[in-house]
Amino acid sequence: MESMTPKMSGEALDLIGQMLAYRCPRYDQLPAITLYSDQVTDALNYYLSPLWPGAEHTVTAAMINNYVKQKVIAPPVKKRYDREQLARLYCICLLKHVFTISEIRDLMTIQTKTYPFEKAYDYFCVELEKALQATFSTRDFSAPSSASRVTPESELVRSSALSVAHRLFTEKFLQLYGLED
């Protein structure tokens, strides 16, 4: 019987390299000016494209409108979205592969009651990058938290980031095996 081992040569190594090189945009790297919906989708698709190469329109205006209707993000002001809304949408786009929209709203509510939004967002970015490193490289998940103070809330962020990384790992390797649609 032939083994179903993925090709660990070029394709798998490229994939691993892409995941290890991925860097989340930090809060201060997001546009400081307000953006229209089409500019938001362009920015989000740009930020997320390294995680899902070749996937067109990872984020659409209809999705954004849905998140506003479900009160996961605040509605735009004069049809424009600010930096915080963009950061929230970025997190939603990552977390929606693992959690329901209701769960994402709850996660964000808990974090913003505990930490200023900018700090909570940047912490999620750091933890996601660490989770990608551990998941796609070392498989060592014992690295200490990057939180200045470990709390149940910071561990919730850390677990969420690990969930996203594990989902990406599973998705990517199923593709390499040729078993995912």
Language-model segments: residues:
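Intrinsically disordered, low-complexity, charge-dense segments enriched in Lys/Arg
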Residues: L107-D181
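Basic helix-turn-helix/winged-helix DNA-binding cores
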Residues: E2-T112
